[in-house]
Amino acid sequence: MSRTARRVGTVVLTAAAVAYLIWKIELRTTLDVLAETRLGWFALAVAIMIVTVPVLAARWSWLLRAHSIEERIPWLTRAYFVAYAAGQILPTSLGGDAVRVVETVRRHAGRTAVVTGTVVLERGLGGAATVLLGAIGFLLSIGRYDVSAYLWLEGVFVFGTIVLAFLFFARSARPLLRRAQPLFERVRLEKPLRAFYDAVHHFRNRPRLLAAVFTVTLAVQTVRILAIWAASEAVGIELDVRVYYVMGPLLFLVMLVPFTLNGLAVREAFFVSFLGSLGVGASQAFAAGFLFFLVTLLLAVPGGAILVWEGVRGGTTPRVKHG
């Protein structure tokens, strides 16, 4: 995908989201809602996001170790926080993943493909876990909340996950992938898809490890959705927590769209649209989305502080010797 196409897509999508928000919300009401934010709930949302980072670092260490790359969990935790900081500048959270790869490869020269594969595999399993959570959330909400308007979107993600699982896990899909390779190269997806494919097939004979990584991913996603619930409670939205297990996975997937400025306006528009379908006022829903944006900003603070400290100290990333 060319930079021009990405920029045009970003401008169009962001402008559409901003226009939708201007149409729906009242600024004065929104400011009043934010002024009455319950800080305890907001602090809980921030804490949930931060305390799960070392768990993600441990999960990543398992995948790296399978490739004979040994890294300490504190350093991997640092890499995650730095990636979150970078993600505030680069388009979508995928930009932060690229930073993780670069920093790790500096310490393990010549292992670019392997490191990229582990990060892309993390993303793939994370997407599958997110879709599974969304499906479970829909089942739990049946008869209590009407979220049928979003059923089609969840269905698209479920179908896409099934298709991708077939393409990347089934050997019979290899001829199809070879035929599609020119298309992937044209839209600049060939390298990340190949990295994911190679990573998956490296772990084909290690199903227990894949299952463990997926289980941890599912657990972390389950806990992190509670941060959305806490941010909503902070502005007085009192809905059953099960609703957020429909909303959260869809939000996580929407945030991966490459045509956003770190989710600016798109995230808030999704909050207004989804919560509005459940009777929540637009200004209150926007306030919840804005607070969740602040949560992601605070999640990036440790990484920003690390970069500033290392810059002042003039340190470099040391290489790890192998063998």
What are these regions (language model features)?
Residues 73-78, 96-97, 107-122, 280-291:
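Membrane-interface alpha-helices at helix entry/exit sites of multi-pass transporters
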Residues 120-128, 293-297:
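Selective transmembrane-helix segments that form parts of the transport pathway or gating/packing helices
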Residues 84-94, 111, 123-135:
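Mid-bilayer segments of alpha-helical transmembrane spans in multi-pass integral membrane proteins
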